Structure formats: C-alpha cells, structure tokens
Amino acid sequence: MAKSKFERTKPHVNIGTIGHVDHGKTSLTAAITKFFGEFKAYDQIDAAPEERARGITISTAHVEYETPNRHYAHVDCPGHADYVKNMITGAAQMDGAILVVSAADGPMPQTREHILLARQVGVPAIVVFLNKCDQVDDAELLELVELEVRELLSKYDFPGDEVPIIKGSALAALEDSSKELGEDAVRSLMAAVDDYIPTPERPIDQPFLMPIEDVFSISGRGTVVTGRVERGIVKVGEEVEIVGIKATAKTTVTGVEMFRKLLDQGQAGDNIGALIRGVGREDVERGQVLCKPGSVKPHTKFKAEAYILTKDEGGRHTPFFTNYRPQFYFRTTDVTGVVTLPEGTEMVMPGDNVAMDVTLIVPIAMEEKLRFAIREGGRTVGAGIVSSIIE
C-alpha cells in the first residue's frame, strides 16, 4: 500500500504530558489516542525508544493524533530524568504542555519541578488534567487540590487563575467505566488544549537568522557564507547583520545559492550559500550569525538552566564548583565561559540539573530559549538553555 501523503491542512502543534511519577501521564496519553488518533496501549507508549539529542540519550515516546482543528505531535517520557533532559535539550519541542496531577495525591515534588522547568525553558502554556478523580469522593478535597495546583502555577509565573483544569480519570477512559470521568473528560481536555494553547508561529514567519557554518572567498565575486537557515526568509538585495564574536557589521546579500543553483531567496530549513557585499573573508567566522538587522543582539552574560551528564552518559566523573570554565557550544561553535552557581549551591554533581549564571569570554548572538551544549575538549558534559539574558 502506498504511504499516505502527510496532509498539511491543519495547523501543527507539539505538545507533551508532564507531572509527577505515577500520576497517570502515560495512561492519559493512551486515552487521548483512543479518541483522537490511532489507539496506542499503555505498554506501547511506556516502552519508549531511546534517542540522542545533543550527545545525550533520552527515552521518549511519540504519538500523534488530531482534533477537528489541529494536528498534534505528543511526547511522553517514561522517567523523571528523561523529562529533565528532554525539556532542557529541546529534543522534543513543546508548544504547550498537559500537566497531569493525581487528585488523590495533589501536587508532588516532580509536579513542582516540571512546572519550574516549563517556565525555565519557555513552554508557552499549560493545561491541567486532574486525574484519578474516581478515587476521590469528597468534592471539597477536589477543590482544594485544584486550588493548590493554581497556586503552584502562579508561583512560577503561569496565569494560575486562568489555566483550564479538567477533572477526570484516564483509567475510566481506557476501561469505559465512566463516560463522564472518562471519554467526556478527555474530550473536554482536548477542547481546552485546542482553545488555550496558542498556535506557534512558524519558523518561516519569524525574522531571518542563519548560523554561519563556513566562509569561502570566490574570486571575482566576493565572500560567501554557508549554513542552514534557522528561521525566516532572506531575499537577494536585502540588508542583513553579522552578529556575534566581533562588533556587529551590516552587509547586503547579493546572491543566494542552493545545490549550486542561484535562487532569489533562501528560507527556513534551506542549506544555502549567501554572497555578501563588501565583507572580507577574514571579517566573518563560523559561530557568528547572519540575521535581519536589529533582530538579535550579541551578549556575554546570561542565566541558564542546565543538565549535567552522569559518568555513565559519558559526562564528568567529578562535581564542579563556581568558576568552572568549560566551553559552551552555541549553534556552530564553542566559546569558553565562566560558571557562577546560585547561592546555597556549593557544587554540581554529574546527573544534576542546575540554574546557573554564565559569563562568556566573547559575545554570541543570543536570545532567551537558545539551547547550548556544555563541552570539555570536544566532549559533551551537559546541555542547557538560556533562561534569561543579563547583559
């Protein structure tokens, strides 16, 4: 049978389940596929395959389903460490998250940690599924748990008062034991997700940016920079900026080439060579970016959330302290930086995730949510994301 063509008629949204261990994330994922996709049983999702992202092995399960309005790619991770790694590396991008909280237990340590991580890595919106409501007879207790969840969300700068909270039971949905708590709740949940989680702006609609991978000099024509366009569109004749490492410079794109053919523009996803006017081969280097003027600024100091690899994952064997000086790999290049740990954190052990301040020795084109790897002599020892820029 011929493989069916992916119909891109509906907007596509990436989503994931987050929350404390055993609160029902995987059961809920299975229940959603039962009504909106090709049904995947709990054990099919739970046996998540391992993937590598930025040198780190992560187990994640991917399912897809659709509502009348949207197509969803949904990620579910079996273990807590996988969530931490997934959110920090961005292995599976999340445009929104479904926070699963057991009504029988209320918010637990990982509930808090996942909300904090969602805030740190810039997940735009959260919808809550209060699971296992069939185990709670007391309506007042349900209200109390809901209140606790809203307070916790507000504490981490999510709009706790507005976040939709759906009460139900993933198990009831899977076993058809209660339509109200089962199927109806799952359908209400997806209606809330459709409505509350914003459709992400497509990369092509964002301001142009291309990380520079290589620089060539072509006799009689000038300097060509190559790379994969990360977002936006660049047209021949447009003014662009070269940002990072050195002082920001302006130039004009006088030609765009792809697969040795001349084009009038390059767009998100294209691997292109851009001919730039009046710039010498020695004025540009790998690690800089070509971008729409004024869209990105160079920075050296930032706050980051990072995951440090364990020894078994090929990471460090020993802890590190304030003033640790590894390389930070941004887009296409390594830059040395100095780490300052937050007050009260004496040291960071392999396997920890940590909030830290970093000062780079040269500026890099940077914005919030930019991901990086932490390396020592070319070997990955951690992964991180810029949570806010200091200067």
Swiss-Prot record:
It holds the Pfam family GTP_EFTU_D2. It catalyses: GTP + H2O = GDP + phosphate + H(+). InterPro entries: EF-Tu_GTP-bd, EF-Tu_GTPase, EFTu-like_2, EFTU_2, G_TR_CS, P-loop_NTPase, Small_GTP-bd, T_Tr_GTP-bd_dom. Gene3D superfamilies: P-loop containing nucleotide triphosphate hydrolases, Translation factors. GO terms for cellular component: cytosol. One of its GO terms (molecular function) is guanosine tetraphosphate binding. Residues 19-26 are annotated as: G1. CDD domains: EF_Tu, EFTU_II, EFTU_III. HAMAP family: EF_Tu_B. This is Elongation factor Tu. It comes from Brucella anthropi (strain ATCC 49188 / DSM 6882 / CCUG 24695 / JCM 21032 / LMG 3331 / NBRC 15819 / NCTC 12168 / Alc 37) (Ochrobactrum anthropi). The gene is tuf1.
